[in-house]
Amino acid sequence: MNISSSRRTSRRRTTALALLACLGAGLLSACQKPAADGPVVRIGYSAWPGWFPWAVTEAKGLFGKEGAAAKLQWFDGYLDSINALNAGQLDCNSQTLNDTISSIAGGADLQVVLQNDYSTGNDQIIAASGINSIAGLKGKKVAAEEGTVDHYLLLKVLKDAGLKGSDITFVPLETGAAAAAFAAGKVDAAGVYAPFTTQALKRPGSKALTTSKEHPGAISDLLVCRTEFVKKNPDQIQKVVNAWFATLKLIKQEPAATLPILVQRSGVSEPEFKAYDAGTTIQTLAENRQNFKPGTTMTSLPYASQQISTFLVEVGLAKTKPDISNLLNASFVDNAKE
């Protein structure tokens, strides 16, 4: 991923023993210096190109270097990570803006503290041969993960084409299962994101009818935390945000050392991974600071939040428009280390 473009006994004795254990295992590079006082920040992430940099953060010990006590938890299923955050099993999670607003509509109290990226092609509605437009999905079986990002994209493009969700036969499947079902010919189309797009497009004659490239800013990928945890532990959140931007800097400066980590976490080949580059626009620190400000396009998080809130109610993914007045917390990007 071309991050360089504009576009993831006594305390002393215990520490000494831990260091010796790392040395003995030949893992000195993975040993982090003792973090500052505060609870461990439990951070969830899942398969998405804009979140794979977190694997570099962990592998290169960047949480510790920034003084953060943080632990990453990988989820094979994206929805599982959202549910874990809502259940208090995580303190922060990597998730989209629309899914965060859906959670708030369901009663969750969450804050956005960082924008990792926005999708510029890696979310796709993929269809079988013979289906040449979104309008052609009418009456067809279409799979996606219900209530999450590509279900949102599917409903958005259906609405733009003058259709409703009821005009298709919706098949709710986890994203990986949706890609597999489409590749096997069990459904006519699927809404999936990278890296699952690679599997879906192996079906002969298949093609993307539309992608997030045609909907700039509609899908923002974020670090979202429980408001209660943010209020109690702002210093720890700040250090986590600092570690993210340190990670982007390292990926830019040392591509040979970091690319293998990104590729391994993605589970695809290096050429396949590099093909995702244009479809995920990583947001720099300067872009984060700008995007948290009010604006009139979907790249402005305040504007996008209002637009998405209205849309979720219109298509039935939320019963009422949620209160998002405290959703965006710009303080951590505003105070992040340059």
What are these regions (language model features)?
Residues 1-40, 336-338:
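Short, low-complexity disordered leader/linker segments with a strong preference
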Residues 34-172, 188-192, 207-210, 217:
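Short, glycine-/small- and polar/acidic-enriched structural segments
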Residues 64, 104, 159, 202, ...:
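Short polybasic/polar patches that bind polyanions
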Residues 91, 98-99, 171, 177-267:
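Pocket-lining segment of extracytoplasmic ligand-binding domains
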Residues 139, 202, 329:
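Phosphate-coordinating loops and pocket residues in cytosolic domains that bind phosphorylated ligands
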Residues 232-317:
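Secondary-structure end/capping motifs
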Residues 305-338:
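Conserved C-terminal helix/tail region of periplasmic/extracytoplasmic solute-binding proteins
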